[in-house]
From Swiss-Prot:
Pathway the protein takes part in: Secondary metabolite metabolism; methylglyoxal degradation; (R)-lactate from methylglyoxal: step 2/2
Function in brief: Thiolesterase that catalyzes the hydrolysis of S-D-lactoyl-glutathione to form glutathione and D-lactic acid.
Binding site for Zn(2+) 1: 52, 54, 107, 128
Catalysed reactions listed for this entry: an S-(2-hydroxyacyl)glutathione + H2O = a 2-hydroxy carboxylate + glutathione + H(+)
Name the UniProt record assigns to this protein: Hydroxyacylglutathione hydrolase
Pfam families: HAGH_C, Lactamase_B
Organism: Neisseria meningitidis serogroup B (strain ATCC BAA-335 / MC58)
Enzyme class, first EC level, given as a word: hydrolase
Co-factor binding details: Binds 2 Zn(2+) ions per subunit.
Alphabetic keyword roster: Hydrolase, Metal-binding, Zinc
Residue sites binding Zn(2+) 2 per the record: 56-57, 128, 166
InterPro entries: Clx_II_MBL, Glyoxalase_II_hydrolase, HAGH_C, Hydroxyacylglutathione_Hdrlase, Metallo-B-lactamas, RibonucZ/Hydroxyglut_hydro
Length: 252
C-alpha cells in the first residue's frame, strides 16, 4: 500500500492510496490532478472517499465518477456525488486493508473520517477535523463536537498516522509557538515545516506540538487564560479558548 499527496487548488492535498494497479482518492477538490496521477502511474480508480460537503473536498467527485462509473463514491448522505452512503461504523475494504468510518463532526455538523487499518498500522484520513498542530474552524458543527472528535482521535495508538486535507502546518506551528514559546518540539517542527509536504503526521508527534491535544496540561491552560482573559475551568474551556485565540491570531 502506497499513499501519496497530490497537490490541488491553493493548499489542498488529495490523498491517493495505491494497491497494485488500483487507487483510492480522498477528498478530490478537482478532477484533473487525480486523472493526471492515474494516467502517469497507470492506475485505475477503484474508490473515492469524501469527508464532508465543502467544494474543496467534493468538487471533483462527480466528474471522477462519470469517468469511472464502476468506481463507488463513499460519503454521507449530504455528499451529492455519493453512490455509497456511509454512516458512523460503516466498514468496507480496499486491497488488504479494512476501512472503518468514524463520525468526527465539529468543522461541519456531519464530517467523516476514514480509518484504514493495514498490516503496518492505522491511517486516518481526517479531512478538516485535525490539522498538524491545529484543528479545523467551526462552520456548521459545534466546538463541543470538535473537542469530542479530538478526544476520540487521542485514544488511538500513538503510531497512528493522520492525513489532513490541507497544508496548514507552518501557520499552525507559529500559533502553537505563541501558546508554548518554550516548547522545543514546536521549534524543531517549525524548522522542518519549511520543507513541504509535512504530512502525514503521527499521533505521537501531534501530542507534542498540537495545542488542541494538549489542553489537559496546566501550563497550556494558564497561557490560554492569560491570553483570553477568561477563567478556564476544564479542558473543554481551554479548547474553546484556544480556537477563539487562533481565529484572532495574526502572524507578526
Amino acid at each position: 500500500m502506497k499513499i501519496t499527496p497530490v497537490k490541488a487548488l491553493t493548499d489542498n492535498y488529495i490523498w491517493m492510496i495505491q494497491h497494485g494497479n488500483h487507487a483510492v482518492c480522498v477528498d478530490p477538490s478537482e478532477p484533473s490532478p487525480v486523472l493526471e496521477f492515474l494516467v502517469r502511474n497507470r492506475l485505475m480508480l477503484a474508490q473515492t472517499w469524501v469527508t464532508h460537503p465543502h467544494p474543496d473536498h467534493e468538487g471533483g467527485a462527480a466528474a471522477l465518477w462519470r469517468g469511472y462509473m464502476e468506481s463507488p463514491v463513499y460519503g454521507e448522505s449530504d455528499i451529492e456525488a455519493a453512490t455509497h452512503t456511509v454512516t458512523a461504523g460503516t466498514q468496507f475494504t480496499f486491497g488488504d486493508g479494512q476501512v472503518t468510518v468514524w463520525a468526527t463532526p465539529g468543522h461541519t455538523d456531519r464530517h467523516t473520517s476514514y480509518l484504514l487499518e493495514t498490516s503496518d498500522g492505522i491511517h486516518v484520513f481526517c479531512g478538516d477535523t485535525l490539522f498538524s498542530a491545529g484543528c479545523g474552524r467551526v462552520f456548521t458543527g459545534t466546538i463541543e463536537q470538535l473537542y469530542d472528535s479530538f478526544q476520540r482521535f487521542n485514544r488511538l495508538p500513538e503510531n497512528t498516522l493522520f492525513y489532513p486535507a490541507h497544508e496548514y502546518t507552518a501557520a499552525n506551528l507559529r500559533f502553537a509557538a505563541h501558546i508554548e514559546p518554550d516548547n522545543a518540539d514546536i521549534q524543531t517542527a517549525l524548522k522542518a515545516a519549511a520543507h513541504t509536504p509535512t504530512l502525514p503526521v503521527t499521533l505521537a508527534h501531534e501530542r507534542r506540538v498540537n495545542p488542541f491535544l494538549r489542553v489537559d496540561l496546566p501550563h497550556v491552560r494558564d497561557r490560554a487564560e492569560a491570553l483570553s482573559g477568561k477563567t478556564l475551568n476544564s479542558s473543554l474551556d481551554t479548547f474553546v479558548a484556544l480556537r477563539e485565540l487562533k481565529n484572532q491570531y495574526r502572524t507578526k
